[in-house]
Amino acid sequence: MSDENNSGAAAPEAQNPGQNAAQPAVRLQILTQYIRDLSFENAVAQKGLPSGEVQPEISVQVSLDARKRPAEHQYEVISKFRVQSSNATDKSPLFLCELDYGGIFHVEGVPEDQLHPFLMIECPRMMFPFVRRIVSDMTRDGGFPPFNMDPVDFVALYRQEIARRTQAQRPADQPLS
């Protein structure tokens, strides 16, 4: 029976035993996650129910920040979400939800030139399901249907931020290439 499942090919580790030895294994551990700042404003409750039909229009803005902590191999990553809903017909505000969600990560084995993208892409990606649940619960608890955010493309967000920083460093009279 064991001969039927064995095709005779060696396992990838056995074929190239020294290939992975030069590159250390990446070690990532979430030490803690927490709400750093949280705000929910229900404009409907403050102004009263809008007249006519309400067609909600929702915008989501995301920004990220990462910094080294005093402890070795520890980094703090902050994801900032601003979720704003307004009535599509008259642009009147419905709610505003702001959440700064943080995580402290222990990261080892990531090459220095890849550490910043790793912190700004992989760490927020790991925290996102928790952010999504908090925003969903907040909108529901605020008197609205739960808002389940679509997944965020953190790679595209990182590339946009790098492009923005590059553009900001370029002198105004220098042409774009």
Curated annotation (Swiss-Prot):
Described purpose of this protein according to its UniProt entry: One of the proteins required for the normal export of preproteins out of the cell cytoplasm. It is a molecular chaperone that binds to a subset of precursor proteins, maintaining them in a translocation-competent state. It also specifically binds to its receptor SecA.
Extent of Low complexity compositional bias: 8-22
Pfam families linked: SecB
InterPro entries in alphabetical order: SecB (IPR003708), SecB-like_sf (IPR035958)
Subcellular location, principal: cytoplasm
Annotated compartments: Cytoplasm
Keyword Protein transport (UniProt): yes
Keyword match Chaperone: yes
Gene it is expressed from: secB
GO biological process: protein folding; protein tetramerization; protein transport
Name of the protein in question: Protein-export protein SecB
Residue ranges, annotated region (Disordered): 1-22
Entry-linked NCBIfam families: PRK05751.1-3, secB
Molecular functions (GO terms): unfolded protein binding
Family designation: Belongs to the SecB family.
Gene Ontology CC terms: cytoplasm
Subunit structure of this chain's protein: Homotetramer, a dimer of dimers. One homotetramer interacts with 1 SecA dimer.
Species this chain originates from: Paracoccus denitrificans (strain Pd 1222)
Keywords, sorted A to Z: Chaperone, Cytoplasm, Protein transport, Translocation, Transport
